[in-house]
């Protein structure tokens, strides 16, 4: 039976640690994506899908972008709602394999690169925490440092938080599992695919 190459074993191990991210894996002058990530990125960005010998009988699906010009590609993926993990080469070699590590995760609400920012609008990340009788929320634009925190204990929590989401227009929402239950009753989440809840 064929066996994966050491580099591909490391890639898959890293991908297991970041399953919800598109993994930009640095190989020389390119960030490469493999397997499902390559298929997704190829489709979303209209890049050529190729293959790489990986130790298996079939070549691994692969696509890539130049490391010196990766920002526009990441920006397009972020705008489509994806998270991107940037995996860089280190100076270490172990068993003749260049070591790599994830140095950054870019999400719609954590963009700070001026190349990827739209200067005419804020880039808010919002957190919602729902308990039995109240809802708390915080939002921040990490590119400017603006931040706000509030709590609401009144009636009709669903309408209240819906109004706040529409007013703030966050690029990303993170929430606890109780707040996730609001997803089915918040009109803004039903009608605008921009708003996505990430449960933590």
Regions inferred by a protein language model and the residue ranges of each:
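Basic, polar low-complexity surface loops/patches
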Residues: 1-200
